[in-house]
Amino acid sequence: MHVHPSTPPTELDGARVERYASLDGIVHLARVTAFIDGAPAPKPAAIAVAVYPGESDAYVFHCSPDWSVLAAGHHASLEVAVLAAESGFPGVAERWVMQHAG
């Protein structure tokens, strides 16, 4: 059984969280590795897909257990962001928790 981190805030870095998922027990395929200060970013505990107000682009936020953003990936749309997250984290599709309708 997977464990959900606490419910994320409604916004991360000013972007509205549309959906989120725990990554407990999910292997990150690491097709793209995020770096912080020249070192690989730590493995996220959860991911969130979010959209900034007035934008159609979406972001996949890699988050710590307390929902601090560790890294982010930019995508052309919400649908593309979701597919990218599901491709990078096989099994996450069954774990999405919807934060907002529509």
Language-model regions, residue ranges each:
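Negatively charged, low-complexity tracts enriched in Asp/Glu with abundant Ser/Thr
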Residues: 1-41
